[in-house]
Amino acid sequence: MEDETVALVIDNGSGMCKAGFAGDDAPRAVFPSIVGRPRHQGVMVGMGQKDSYVGDEAQSKRGILTLRYPIEHGIVTNWDDMEKIWHHTFYNELRVAPEEHPVLLTEAPINPKSNREKMTQIFFETFNAPAFYVSIQAVLSLYASGRVTGIVLDSGDGVTHVVPIYSGFSLPHAIMRLDMAGRDLTDYLMKILSERGYSFTNSAEREIVRDIKEKLCYVALDFEQELQTASQSSSLEKSYELPDGRVITIGNERFRAPEALFHPSMLGLEAAGIHETTFNSIMKCDVDVRKDLYGNIVMSGGTTMYPGIAERMHKEISALAPTSIKVKITAPLERKYSVWIGGSILASLGTFQQMWISKQEYDEAGPTIVHRKCY
């Protein structure tokens, strides 16, 4: 069924790796970006113990493993572990031979040059890819929404970026990075639930809290008003059944956790909220493009999935923007995977086929070719 040379699209996030085939409308494989190694050598003797586990298998065996995330705040920090994740992607998840398919990889907006070179080198030298390309995550999200100009708020598990894009090119001087994302909100929810008397501490319990966050949290349009409503009635309370059968009740925590996106000071961070960061990024752009950016604010990534976030963002940005400006927030339903979807669209365009870095070009020019061909 697969075309012999169909391109592979891999979106490496801090929390999840999304991988699949160009032209598909969703990734085939979505698994945690983690590598686990046994804490004690020889504990599992005779159980066919491996020296490392990746993704879901590492997650399920986490009791006996030390888990590491090779991508921190969107940037690869551990190349040995990263290589294991890519190996797992090809051989276990997609079941393809990397030397038979062009590979489109995604990268964080302010990825160091040396990192792009290292990625390029690994794909050509370790995996023998026939062709390779690396694309900025936020730009792909914008493509997926059918635009080439706009400003993308991309918030995942490990990092949040605001990236203004004009005619398909990001404007690097105005890109903003906020080291606050899904993982921090999960931690904060653990903290405020413990104040209610529910104790969640270890990594297994953290997964439960992440699930509570994804199922029950939302963004309030008016935080103070919502707090008042929550204190006066039980209308906002929801119950959640824990794996052991106990049922817990969660009230104002439902909207207190995501509120930190707008007020990072709640987490003890000295940073502007996502609304101010977006506004600041727009203000760093040329005055002539601002109107187009205000009218095309696109949300992307799992941490933008909270109900109510687009409405709140609209309210906050409108309060900051000049009165005559029309503010439009787009929050596509598939925004959890819009980076991957944008990659799938790009890699299957006929016009894109001359953009790939070929193995021959790499052999002639070396890893620095990535800066000339991918920008």
Curated annotation (Swiss-Prot):
<keyword id="KW-0378">Hydrolase</keyword>
<dbReference type="GO" id="GO:0016787">
    <property type="term" value="F:hydrolase activity"/>
</dbReference>
<comment type="function">
    <text>Actins are highly conserved proteins that are involved in various types of cell motility and are ubiquitously expressed in all eukaryotic cells.</text>
</comment>
<protein>
    <recommendedName>
        <fullName>Actin</fullName>
        <ecNumber>3.6.4.-</ecNumber>
    </recommendedName>
</protein>
<dbReference type="InterPro" id="IPR004000">
    <property type="entry name" value="Actin"/>
</dbReference>
<keyword id="KW-0067">ATP-binding</keyword>
<dbReference type="GO" id="GO:0005737">
    <property type="term" value="C:cytoplasm"/>
</dbReference>
<keyword id="KW-0547">Nucleotide-binding</keyword>
<dbReference type="InterPro" id="IPR020902">
    <property type="entry name" value="Actin/actin-like_CS"/>
</dbReference>
<comment type="similarity">
    <text>Belongs to the actin family.</text>
</comment>
<keyword id="KW-0206">Cytoskeleton</keyword>
<keyword id="KW-0963">Cytoplasm</keyword>
<dbReference type="InterPro" id="IPR043129">
    <property type="entry name" value="ATPase_NBD"/>
</dbReference>
<dbReference type="GO" id="GO:0015629">
    <property type="term" value="C:actin cytoskeleton"/>
</dbReference>
<dbReference type="InterPro" id="IPR004001">
    <property type="entry name" value="Actin_CS"/>
</dbReference>
<dbReference type="Pfam" id="PF00022">
    <property type="entry name" value="Actin"/>
</dbReference>
<dbReference type="GO" id="GO:0005524">
    <property type="term" value="F:ATP binding"/>
</dbReference>
